[in-house]
Amino acid sequence: MGNHYIPNSAHKEEMLKEIGLSSIEELFADIPEKFIKEELNLPEGKSEYEVFLEMNEILEKNKTVLEMPTFLGAGTYFHYIPAHVKHLIERSEFLTSYTPYQPEISQGMLQALFEYQSLIAELVGLPVVNSSMYDWGTAMAEAALMTVRLHKGKRKKFVVPKHTHPERLQVLRTYTRGPEVEIVTVNWNERGQVDVEDLKEKVKDAAGVYIEIPNFFGLLEEEIREVGEIAHEAGAYFVVGVDPTILGIVEAPGELGADIVVGEASYFGNPMNFGGPRAGIFAVKNDMKLIRQMPGRIIGMTKDAEGKRAFVMTLQTREQHIRRAKATSNICSNEALVAVAAAIHIASLGPKGIRELGEVILKNTAYLKKRLSEVAEIPFDGVNFKDVLVRFDKPYREIHEELLKRNIHGGYYVGSHFPELGEAALFAATETTRKEWVDALISALKEVI
């Protein structure tokens, strides 16, 4: 007897009869025999339970950061995520309501994204925020193109520090190759920060000037206000990239004179997850000239025909809904679920929690830096947040291999990006870094070096 839900031969025979065939082999009669008669190098099929056991055996080879302490930062960090964040974003109202072509139907998702925008605006000190980009790198690249558009193409130069995160710099170069925007890099000084004198020589006719908080070496740029003033005096827009977990303990980029702020929202509420997905921050001043040139989607609050509060996608004429050549951006979606997770985490922390988070990271980074200075050279003096640059006399790859043997994941090798730094690596700490992990790292380094 045929059953609608269990595979059986009755259904198969019925379908074959309908198309006038007597066997499955006849379906593939047109394929030359030499291609279908050869034995495939495949194992015998397994039951679902057997597959489960095999997959579990493979997965057990992985090690979490709790089983193997990691100091590998350089843009991806282990942060603690409160349990309720995952629980809330897994609700079907969020998990399945990808912004549709009639977005006003999903009022809950639009409101959540509006709250994300509002929270980020408060953090970065600029009033207008979009509902996210793909990541920090794409946000920075879109900011560069935006500054060129704002100058109506008369200026096609974007100035960035040489010590911008190398992968973000790669994304920027990819984005700007087609529009033929010139990327000019500014050297760092003896303290590992932007060389202001070099900037003054290169800023002429620039559409925008970019700087990061903290920079790739983990250092806080002490002359960031001056960098902004130099940019504005040259008629360029000032773009600041920021790790938002620091914003509880430093001035907001908007207060430092930034016209555009970009960054990485996924440091809140989202796991490392092999580096993605992420959500890029994009914020601008309250200037319609800038707002109309923003990339991505903006969620606005208004009233419907009955006078009730409603959330909408606003200023959509900037987007890909119009002719492609006229659109400010052709990023076709945002990272909505990642942004909602970030919003939930930020709201849960509140102003006091955000400040305490920054203070703990700063304290842990300082301890890591102090202990690392006992075994290696710290080439740049200054205040570090998360990342610390360390230089060794011995090839770092050898050191790293030895650390792995001792169940410790070392720092990120930067010598391939900046050969002039020698055998250097970035070691990172966050609020999750434990004192005993750092002590174990130093003990291991003393053995290895």
UniProtKB/Swiss-Prot annotation:
Highest taxon above the source species: Archaea
The record's listing under CDD domains reads: GDC-P
What InterPro entries does this protein's entry cite? GcvPA, GDC-P_N, GDC_P, PyrdxlP-dep_Trfase, PyrdxlP-dep_Trfase_major, PyrdxlP-dep_Trfase_small
* Record note on quaternary structure: The glycine cleavage system is composed of four proteins: P, T, L and H. In this organism, the P 'protein' is a heterodimer of two subunits.
Instruction: Give the matching Gene3D superfamilies.
Output: Aspartate Aminotransferase, domain 1, Type I PLP-dependent aspartate aminotransferase-like (Major domain)
The record's EC number reads: 1.4.4.2
State the protein's name.
Probable glycine dehydrogenase (decarboxylating) subunit 1
List the PANTHER family. Answer: GLYCINE CLEAVAGE SYSTEM P-PROTEIN, GLYCINE DEHYDROGENASE (DECARBOXYLATING)
Q: What class of enzyme is it?
A: oxidoreductase
What's one Pfam family here? GDC-P
What does the similarity note say? Belongs to the GcvP family. N-terminal subunit subfamily.
Q: Does the keyword Oxidoreductase apply?
A: yes
- Per the UniProt record, the source organism is Pyrococcus horikoshii (strain ATCC 700860 / DSM 12428 / JCM 9974 / NBRC 100139 / OT-3)
The catalytic activity, as recorded, is: N(6)-[(R)-lipoyl]-L-lysyl-[glycine-cleavage complex H protein] + glycine + H(+) = N(6)-[(R)-S(8)-aminomethyldihydrolipoyl]-L-lysyl-[glycine-cleavage complex H protein] + CO2
Q: What is the stated purpose of this protein?
A: The glycine cleavage system catalyzes the degradation of glycine. The P protein binds the alpha-amino group of glycine through its pyridoxal phosphate cofactor; CO(2) is released and the remaining methylamine moiety is then transferred to the lipoamide cofactor of the H protein.
The GO annotation for biological process reads: glycine decarboxylation via glycine cleavage system; nucleoside metabolic process
Single GO molecular function: glycine dehydrogenase (decarboxylating) activity
Cross-referenced SUPFAM superfamilies, in alphabetical order?
Answer: PLP-dependent transferases
Keywords, A to Z?
Oxidoreductase
